[in-house]
Regions:
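Expand to "…catalyze enediolate/carbanion chemistry for C-C bond making/breaking, isomerization
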Residues: 1-292
């Protein structure tokens, strides 16, 4: 049984055509490994990569890492076979591209009908039409396996003909709305990749921006990005300390039934109590993960 709160600070894409990369992923400190059959694999290598990815999922050995298989779209020559292989392999989740509507979610869900019940569906949110269907797409989770939004900023930028700037100004409204739609239906929300592989100085403020929006973590394209994502998307120490104080304060007998308290000079309401429990659970899950 999966923990109620699971860290997803870093989700590393690994080309499924590269056996050495897959083996390396078993020892990297990322929270999620995404075996990629789509963008990272050339057309002539996709069939072999599919077999390799399915074998890797079945073999396991990824430890506490969540294992996700990114497939090609149903409209491509490889999509149906990718989904059949994914259903048979039974990863933690299957990441599907270019989800534009609830109908797309339902089509992918039907294609995964033979998968284990625990296998979830993650949707790439990376097109202009998807930006205006965020709530209906998220609502499809009530009747499908849908469990996560993963942002695809590169494809979105291409469709919008938008420039990718350090502050991501063109995409800020969509990033914020994607998180809100995901949260409205209890979904995971992951930010998109940072394209500048060697510019770690620029990665950190971008992650801080994503964390401020409320993303659970970030998809990454290189192992050197993992440490920064893991640090920035973890609950800050001062927030964990305050969360513990909130839980302790509301747990005192004299505060039973009270809706609001003063905790270390700050207002703490009942809504803060539930968030405090979530932060403490997440911090504990991260501590356990990093000790394993």
């Amino acid at each position: 049984m999966q923990p109620t709160v699971r860290p997803r600070r870093s989700a590393l894409y690994m080309p499924a055509s590269n056996a050495r990369a897959i083996e390396k992923a078993r020892s990297l400190p990322c929270d999620v490994v995404i075996l990629d059959l789509e963008d990272a694999v050339a057309p002539e290598a996709k069939v072999e990569a599919r077999a390799s990815a399915a074998a890797a999922v079945k073999a396991g050995g990824f430890g506490r890492r969540e294992v996700v298989l990114r497939v090609n779209g149903l409209s491509t020559p490889w999509g149906a076979d990718d989904l059949a292989a994914a259903a048979a392999a039974g990863p933690d989740a299957v990441l599907v591209p270019k989800v534009n509507s609830p109908a797309d979610v339902e089509a992918y869900d039907r294609a995964l009908a033979a998968a284990p019940a625990a296998t979830r569906l993650w949707a790439m949110i990376e097109t202009c039409p998807a930006m205006f269907e965020l709530m209906p797409i998220a609502a499809a989770s009530a009747r499908t396996r849908l469990a996560a939004f993963t942002m695809g900023i590169n494809d979105l930028a291409k469709e919008m003909k938008a420039r990718q700037t350090p502050g991501r100004e063109a995409f800020v409204p969509f990033l914020s709305m994607a998180v809100a739609a995901a949260r409205a239906y209890g979904l995971i929300a992951l930010d998109g990749v940072h394209n500048e592989i060697d510019d770690l100085a620029a990665l950190e403020p971008s992650c801080q921006q994503g964390a401020a929006f409320g993303f659970d973590g970030r998809s990454v394209i290189h192992p050197t990005h993992i440490a920064i994502c893991n640090r920035v998307y973890a609950p800050p120490a001062d927030e964990v300390t305050w969360a513990a104080a909130v839980v302790e304060a509301f747990g005192r007998p004299e505060n039973e039934g009270r809706g609001a308290l003063r905790v270390e000079g700050r207002l703490a309401e009942r809504l803060h109590l539930s968030e405090a429990h979530r932060l403490l659970d997440l911090a504990a899950a991260i501590e356990t993960a990093e000790a394993s």
